[in-house]
Swiss-Prot record:
Keywords: Magnesium, Metal-binding, Thiamine biosynthesis, Transferase. Pathway: Cofactor biosynthesis; thiamine diphosphate biosynthesis; thiamine phosphate from 4-amino-2-methyl-5-diphosphomethylpyrimidine and 4-methyl-5-(2-phosphoethyl)-thiazole: step 1/1. The gene is thiE. It comes from Arthrobacter sp. (strain FB24). One of its GO terms (molecular function) is thiamine-phosphate diphosphorylase activity. PANTHER family: THIAMINE-PHOSPHATE PYROPHOSPHORYLASE (PTHR20857), THIAMINE-PHOSPHATE SYNTHASE (PTHR20857:SF15). This is Thiamine-phosphate synthase. GO terms for biological process: thiamine biosynthetic process; thiamine diphosphate biosynthetic process.
Length: 237
């Protein structure tokens, strides 16, 4: 499958640090993929570039073994050097146009959003050649991984579901070209999501989720991933 096809089919996205305290990064990411995680992002602000590149090689090996995607947070230079198929940026990180210029048209690029206006802008940025490939909405609930950022609640998840549901595929002939029928722009709910509330997120309209502690703190990452996917299905039914 192409990277875009893998993104379209993705439902469970995991962000993890380097797990330096446990020393089990390779085993952990392999177990997470085995349990059904579709994308794993290495997000660890404390890493030196050389350390991050070394861990990304480990992540790439596991991703290829399972036929899944792997992602770099914030840094287009690291994404380029590592050959990562996915780059995720925040509102204050490298602008989409600059990231696209750096990485080229084949890279999958995602963006964090926290408001109605940012969601609308993300959807608008998906149109045309080199547009945005996916966006995340959150944090739905307060989370220690994003200290100081207020929770946006389920209302913004509902808004994203409605707004993204009105979109079509990327335009032909550049940004000014006519729209064509196709899949909706993929988006993920993120922030404080765990087994206890994932059904609420799904009921609000999210088909895809990003998690951190729900898997990183689990005794059995593979089982945790399977349980989250089952709950995501249950909430949507």
């Amino acid at each position: 499958m192409t990277e875009q096809a893998l993104l379209t089919d993705a439902r469970l996205y995991l962000c993890t640090d380097a797990r330096t305290d446990r020393g089990d990064f390779a085993d952990f990411v392999d177990a997470a993929y085995a349990g059904g995680v579709d994308i794993i992002q290495l997000r660890d602000k404390g890493l030196e570039a050389a350390e991050e590149l070394e861990l990304l090689e480990v992540l790439e090996t596991a991703a290829r073994r399972h036929g899944r995607l792997w992602s770099v947070n914030d840094r287009a230079d690291i994404a380029s050097l590592s050959g990562a198929p996915v780059l995720h940026v925040g509102q204050k990180d490298l602008p989409l146009a600059s990231a696209r210029k750096f990485l080229g048209g084949e890279a999958v690029i995602g963006l964090s959003t926290h408001s109605h206006g940012q969601i609308d802008a993300a959807i608008a940025a998906s149109r045309g050649a080199g547009g945005l490939d996916y966006f995340c909405v959150g944090p739905v609930w307060a989370t220690p991984t994003k200290p100081g950022r207020a929770a946006v609640g389920l209302e913004l998840v509902r808004y994203a579901a409605e707004a993204a549901g009105k979109t079509t595929a990327k335009t032909t002939g550049g940004a000014a070209g006519p729209t064509v029928d196709g899949p909706r722009l993929p988006w993920f709910a993120i922030g404080g999501i765990d087994l206890g509330n994932v059904e609420q997120v799904a009921a609000a309209g999210a088909e895809r989720i990003v998690v951190v502690r729900a898997i990183t703190e689990a005794d059995d990452p593979a089982a945790a991933a399977r349980s989250l996917l089952a709950a995501l299905d249950a909430g949507a039914s």
